[in-house]
Amino acid sequence: MQKTFDITWGFFPLVEFIVSSSNQIGSRYKTALDIGSGDGVHTEILRSAGLEVFQLDKYSDTAEYKEDFISHNFNHKFDVIFCSHVIEHQRNVGHFLDKIFDVMSDDGLLLISAPKHRAEVLINGHLNCFYSTYFMQQLIHAGFDLKNGKYLSCMGIENAAIVSKAKNFELSEREESGYIWTEKHQERSCIELVNQELHNLIAWFHNCTVLYPSDTQLQFDVHFPENYQSKAIDITAERHGFKITI
């Protein structure tokens, strides 16, 4: 049966993950945690793709965990952590990413997205700016592997990443400051870490196999693998004029 969902945020990492990892969902990736799940639409998309998904949202009546993510003590880990437009609300971004790292299975994936509005723009509840220059560094310092993972600069809409735990990360790094880039940081980065200016509003998909930049009006194309079997999921992002069946 065809299922239709409309979402505003998190469109890009969802499409890239579900299509590119289709053959591993249900085997390598079985369980997922949706942090800040809201009304649960992202959860339902992930469930329709074949994952067992748990919602965490202290403001939601449908969430399995109606608690604060930082304060809750989990008794197991998850293969996939999904976090769409939640990190910008955190007072302590590093602590938040540390907790995600700790509840994610050792060979799991983090799917995370954040808005990319200018730092000069004041938005209710947005305590942080996640232009790529900041977002990448936060993920790298928290021990996630951007070099071998996927980074998605989605035009003026959002930045996102699909990343695993970096093999060269040690928990003792949490005691370090962000004073200087180390060799380990360079090994985890998808760009050379040097003082530079990054263009924030372009379509750029590092290591992605489904989403590609294009010269079309949408600024991106979707390439399905040759033997891909559709999940019969229609996803629209009406606010941005996107629609896709995966």
Question: Can you describe what each PLM-predicted range is?
Answer:
Residues 144-155:
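Conserved S-adenosyl-L-methionine
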Residues 1-76, 80-82, 95-97, 101, ...:
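Conserved N-terminal segment of class I S-adenosyl-L-methionine
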Residues 122-127:
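Short, solvent-exposed loop/turn segments at secondary-structure boundaries
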Residues 107-115:
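Conserved beta-strand signature within the Rossmann-like core of class I S-adenosyl-L-methionine
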Residues 115-120, 152-153:
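Short "lid" loop at the C-terminus of a central beta-strand within the Rossmann-like core
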